[in-house]
Each structure stands twice: as structure tokens, then as C-alpha cells.
Amino acid sequence: MESFLQNPLPTRISELEEQIALIEAEQKRCTESIRGLMAREDMEKGIFFPAEIHELHQRKNMLETHIQYRRVRVNRLRMRGAR
């Protein structure tokens, strides 16, 4: 999944929408991982995962930025009449 994030944005709406769907799925996995880590934390035993949770939040935010770039590109292409 990471490979296409480093390439230039596609110029076809269908490709952009496919990428948005993939990125949203990865965001969902991040959210599930965050919830899982938070559920496993135990204050009494001193079990915490702050670094892992922070990293996942950062990843989720980065993915949101990629989604926004793709949505802007889709909107621009639609304004120009592309498919």
C-alpha cells in the first residue's frame, strides 16, 4: 500500500477513488489497532503503549492528508469534465 503513496497522483478519477478506498481501509485498521492497544493497557500493572498509540495516530493523520489530496484532485478533474 505504501508504494503508491509516494508516486504522483493519478489523473483518472477511478484510480483516485480506488486509492481513497485503500487508504480508508488502512485508516480503519489503525483505529482498530489503537482501540486494541488501549484495551490492553493496565494502569495497575503498569502496562501502557503510548509510543505505539501515538505512532498509529500519526499514521492515521498522514493517511487523512493523502485522502484529502486525492479528493481535491477528483474535484478538479470533475470540474474539467474528466472521468
Where are these regions (language model features)?
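Structured alpha-helical bundle/scaffold domains in large eukaryotic membrane-trafficking regulators
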Residues: R35, D42, N75-A82
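Short E/K-rich amphipathic alpha-helical oligomerization segments
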Residues: A25-H54
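Heptad-repeat alpha-helical rod positions in long coiled-coil/spectrin-like domains
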Residues: T11-S14, E18-E32, N61, T65-Y69
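Generic intrinsically disordered, low-complexity segments enriched for polar/acidic and small residues
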Residues: M1, K45-G46, L63-H66
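Amphipathic alpha-helical coiled-coil segments
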Residues: I53-M79
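Short, charge-rich amphipathic alpha-helices with coiled-coil/heptad character
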Residues: M1-I13, M43-E44, A82-R83
